[in-house]
UniProtKB/Swiss-Prot annotation:
<comment type="subunit">
    <text>Homodimer.</text>
</comment>
<keyword id="KW-0808">Transferase</keyword>
<feature type="binding site">
    <location>
        <begin position="248"/>
        <end position="250"/>
    </location>
    <ligand>
        <name>substrate</name>
    </ligand>
</feature>
<dbReference type="InterPro" id="IPR023606">
    <property type="entry name" value="CoA-Trfase_III_dom_1_sf"/>
</dbReference>
<protein>
    <recommendedName>
        <fullName>Formyl-CoA:oxalate CoA-transferase</fullName>
        <ecNumber>2.8.3.16</ecNumber>
    </recommendedName>
</protein>
<feature type="binding site">
    <location>
        <begin position="72"/>
        <end position="75"/>
    </location>
    <ligand>
        <name>CoA</name>
    </ligand>
</feature>
<dbReference type="InterPro" id="IPR003673">
    <property type="entry name" value="CoA-Trfase_fam_III"/>
</dbReference>
<feature type="binding site">
    <location>
        <begin position="273"/>
        <end position="275"/>
    </location>
    <ligand>
        <name>CoA</name>
    </ligand>
</feature>
<comment type="function">
    <text>Involved in the catabolism of oxalate and in the adapatation to low pH via the induction of the oxalate-dependent acid tolerance response (ATR). Catalyzes the transfer of the CoA moiety from formyl-CoA to oxalate.</text>
</comment>
<dbReference type="Pfam" id="PF02515">
    <property type="entry name" value="CoA_transf_3"/>
</dbReference>
<dbReference type="InterPro" id="IPR017659">
    <property type="entry name" value="Formyl_CoA_transfer"/>
</dbReference>
<feature type="binding site">
    <location>
        <position position="38"/>
    </location>
    <ligand>
        <name>CoA</name>
    </ligand>
</feature>
<dbReference type="InterPro" id="IPR050483">
    <property type="entry name" value="CoA-transferase_III_domain"/>
</dbReference>
<feature type="binding site">
    <location>
        <position position="104"/>
    </location>
    <ligand>
        <name>CoA</name>
    </ligand>
</feature>
<feature type="binding site">
    <location>
        <begin position="137"/>
        <end position="140"/>
    </location>
    <ligand>
        <name>CoA</name>
    </ligand>
</feature>
<dbReference type="InterPro" id="IPR044855">
    <property type="entry name" value="CoA-Trfase_III_dom3_sf"/>
</dbReference>
<dbReference type="GO" id="GO:0033611">
    <property type="term" value="P:oxalate catabolic process"/>
</dbReference>
Length: 416
């Protein structure tokens, strides 16, 4: 089966989550991704949050499928030589080290260009070079805090909150992926590679653009009418936290369903659409609200929007969340059950679509991983297990022209 990136070679000089999520997607698209790891230890996530002693952790296996792994010590002369040979043959190199780390290894962007002018160099950092935080070590929640997500997440009477979704890590990897694919297309026109940099702060901010929209509206108006604070609360000079309110001008809220007392996920998300208000009233048994001036328009409803949701909840609390969604969908009401990760892991439709995939790795055995989120009509990514540490070292070195004796000598010299 032909794949989009067949014939593209990627050097994966990344660790933890932001970089590996990007390179894993490149591998799913058919690129030959060679993960370069520290001899004897590898990516730190091989060891973090283990569920089986002395076996690669799920943290690693779920972010590194379809890759090849080599152990390489770039601090040695032989290791540097191997690295230069790899760069000479590669199309893309991706790194997410702390600022300056790869330069200290001797692989500055300028030197990489000298070795291979066609190479595309993808780099993830916490912040842009012009940022006052450029030297701050950035992880998931650091990026969420600096990118605008934390200040606008949570309830108005509580502290900022970070999202459980990987807005700082995997989201940054997906943004870099887009940049790398664009750079590949650009290389077809120019014949030259380029550097693609992606800051975690920028990736989070790109998902918070509606909040930047709201900031500008707040600066001009002094209020935001779709937020729960309007019209009875107060607004400061920055976009407030809105709890579970919808952010697109359509009121929404989390509502209890049957069993909420013992099931922490017995809830649905319910959205009120202006154009669907009549159907909403019929669905919840309040047909009189259709023509009542206190309810008939979005502007009229906002002052008592929580009373409206409380009334809707009187119905949803009597039935199972799945029954509630099935019923409300008949009235074209945007809604969804709050699904736990347990439910998602067992969902047959997600298995059927390839969104959740079972793979098998030597030593670990079978495990679940997230599959490719994009569905293509011309090809289906074949999701494979993550590599064992150094599993492909010999094969990759042989491809570079090294003999068995030379490989053995490099191992003796701790270069691999």
């Amino acid at each position: 089966m032909s794949t989009p990136l067949q014939g593209i070679k990627v050097l994966d000089f990344t660790g933890v989550q932001s970089g590996p999520s990007c390179t894993q997607m490149l591998a799913w698209f058919g690129a030959d991704v060679i993960k370069i790891e520290r001899p004897g230890f590898g990516d730190v996530t091989r060891h973090q949050l283990r569920d089986i002693p002395d076996i690669d952790a799920l943290y690693f296996t779920m972010l590194n499928s379809n890759k090849r792994s080599i152990e390489l010590n770039t601090k040695t002369a032989e290791g540097k030589e191997v690295m230069e040979k790899l760069i000479r043959e590669a199309d893309i190199l991706v790194e997410n080290f702390h600022p300056g780390a790869i330069d200290h290894m001797g692989f500055t962007w300028e030197h990489i260009q000298e070795i291979n002018p066609r190479l595309i160099f993808g780099s993830i950092k916490g912040f842009d070079e012009c940022s006052p935080y450029v030297n701050v070590k950035a992880y998931e929640n650091v990026a969420q805090a600096a990118g605008g997500a934390a200040s606008t997440t949570g309830f108005w009477d509580g502290p900022p909150l970070v999202s459980a979704a990987a807005l700082g890590d995997s989201n940054t990897g997906m943004h870099l992926l887009i940049g790398l694919l664009a750079a590949l297309l650009h290389r077809e026109k120019t014949g030259r590679g380029q550097r693609v940099t992606m800051s975690m702060q920028d990736a989070v901010l790109n998902l918070c653009r509606v909040k930047l929209r709201d900031q500008q509206r707040l600066d001009k108006l002094g209020y935001l009418e779709e937020y729960p604070q309007y019209p009875n609360g107060t607004f400061g000079d920055a976009v407030p936290r809105g709890g579970n309110a919808g952010g697109g001008g359509q009121p929404g809220w989390i509502l209890k369903c049957k069993g909420w007392e013992t099931d922490p996920n017995a809830y649905i998300y319910f959205t009120i659409q202006e154009q669907n208000w009549e159907n909403t009233c019929k669905a919840i048994g309040k047909p009189e609200w259709i023509t009542d001036p206190a309810y008939s328009t979005a502007h009229a409803r906002q002052p008592h929007i929580f009373d409206i949701f409380a009334e809707i909840e009187k119905y949803t609390v009597t039935i199972d969340k799945h029954e509630a969604v099935a019923y409300l969908t008949q009235f074209d009401i945007p809604c969804a059950p709050v699904l736990s990760m347990k439910e998602i892991s067992l969902d047959p439709s997600l298995r059927q679509s390839g969104s959740v995939v079972e793979v098998e790795q030597p030593l670990r055995g079978k495990y679940l991983t997230v599959g490719c989120p994009m569905k293509f009509s011309a090809f289906t990514p074949d999701i494979k297990a993550a590599p064992l540490l150094g599993e492909h070292t010999a094969a990759v070195l042989q491809e570079l022209g090294y003999s068995d004796d030379e490989i053995a000598a490099m191992k003796q010299n701790h270069a691999i």
